[in-house]
Amino acid sequence: EQGRPIIERIRKTHPEYKILLTFFSPSGYEVRKNYQGVDYIFYLPIDTPRNARRFLDAAHPEIAIFVKYEFWLNLLRDLRRRKVRTYIVSAIFRRNSIFFRPYGGYWRQALESFDVMFVQNEESKKLLAGLGFDNVIVAGDTRFDRVAEIAAAAKHIDIIDRFKGDKRLFVAGSTW
C-alpha cells in the first residue's frame, strides 16, 4: 500500500512504462497478487549476489524504487553497478539503526546506491547529512496519502452501525 500512490502516479504520467512490483513476504504478495495497476507481480528472490544478478538480467530495469525499510544489499550493489536509477521513498532513519553504528559500513555503502532518498522527516535527513549524503529530500510518508484516499472512498456499512450502536468504535490493525 505504501508504494501504491507512486505506482499510480507513474502509471498516469508514463503509461508507456512497464511496471514490475515485487514482494518478498507471502503476506504482501497474497494481498496484491492480482493488483491491476502494474504489469508484472513477482516474488523477489533471496538477496544473494547470484540471485540479484539473475533477477536483474531477467527484469532489465531502467528505474528501481524501494520503499521505507527495503535495503537489499546485493540487489542495490548490482543496480548501482549497472547504473540503474535507484530511489527509496518513505524511508525513515533512527539514530540507533545499523547505518549509524561503527560496524554499519556495509549498510552505509548500500545507501550510496540511491540517486535520491525521499525520507519521512527532517531527523532522517539530518542523520544522513551527518554521513555526507546530500541527495535527500523530506517528502513525508506515502502511507498517509493512501489512508486519506481510502477514507475518502469509504463506503457506509450497515452492519458496523448495528454493531456499535451509538457508541464510538476504535479499530486497530497491524499495531506492532
Residue ranges of model-derived segments:
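Active-site and donor-binding regions of nucleotide-sugar-utilizing enzymes
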Residues: 1-153, 176
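Conserved donor-binding/catalytic core segment of Leloir-type glycosyltransferases
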Residues: 1, 163-176
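A short helix/loop element that forms part of the nucleotide-sugar donor recognition site in Leloir-type
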Residues: 149-164
